[in-house]
C-alpha cells in the first residue's frame, strides 16, 4: 500500500531533482529518521526549504502550505500532485487538522513550518507561534515528532536579496515526543554564524537590502538606503557599509539594524501623528477562499492605530495576522 503523497511527481523529484539539490547546495545531514508515521517540523528560512529536507528522507512528505499559494493555477497543479495540505493563516483551520490526522492515520508523513512564514532577519520568529496551540497539536497526534533544523540556507540566499551566494547548508534531525522539538528548531543564523564563521561569497550581495532596511543607521533618514554590488549606501548622508562573505553588514548583524530602525520608525510615526503612502496597490480577497474580489491603487495612511486605505479604515489592534508574501505583498 502506497503512502500519502507517494505520487509520480514525488518519485521523479526524489530520483532526479534531490541529487542535484544535494550537490548544488552542498547539503550535509545528521541524525536518524524513524519509520513513518511521524510529524516533521522545521524552521522556515527559504522558499525551497522542503527541497533541503527531501534528499535525506526516503518517504514522501505531505507539506502544509499556505492557501494563497494555491491561487496560482500552475502552482496549484504541482502542489496537488505532491499531496500538499492547504492551510489558512492566522485563524483556526479544522479542515487542515483533519487532513493532518488522516495522513498520519494512513501511515504517512506531514511536514509543517510552525513559523508559517520565512524569516526576514535570519532569526527564529517566536512571536508567530502559539506555544499552547502547538503543544496541544503535538500531544494529540500520538506519533513521533521529527525536528529538522536548517542552518546556512538563509545566509546562502537571504529572502530580501536579489542574488544568492555560494551555498553551504546543514540540516540536523532529531526525534522527540513533546514540545522540546520546538526548542530544537529555534535557530538564529547569526548566533550560528558567529560560532562557525562559514564563508558565503557572492556578487552583488547588497542588492535588495531596501526590502528589509528602510532607515539609515547613521542619519535616520527614511527610504534612502540602497544596495550597490556588495555595499549598502545611504543617498542622504553618503555613508556606506560593506556586506562581507560572512553576511555581516559593516561588522553588524542584520537583526540589530532591523530592530533599531523599528524603534526609530515607531518614534517617527508617534511624533508625526500620521504617515502617508501614496498610490499603494491594494487587493481585496475573500476571507474563506482568498479568491480575488477587486484590485486597485489608493492612498494609504497610518494614524492612531488605524490603517486607512482610501475611505476604508482598518483597526491595527484587531488584525489577526501579518505576513509578507513573495517578498512584495503584505497580507
Residue ranges and their predicted role:
Residues 288-330:
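Phosphoinositide-binding peripheral membrane targeting modules
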Residues 8-44:
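Helix-to-loop junction immediately C-terminal to a conserved catalytic motif
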Residues 223-226, 243-244:
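Short, non-ligating residues that shape and space the ligands of small metal-coordination modules
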Residues 49, 75, 79-113, 126-156:
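Active-site-proximal cofactor/substrate-binding loop regions of enzyme domains
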Residues 238-246:
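Short Cys/His-rich micro-motifs in 6-15 aa windows
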Residues 109, 121-180, 200-206, 210-218, ...:
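A cross-family acyltransferase "interaction/gating" segment
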Residues 249-300:
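Anionic N-terminal interaction surfaces
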Residues 34-91, 252:
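Catalytic core of membrane glycerolipid acyltransferases/transacylases, capturing the structured
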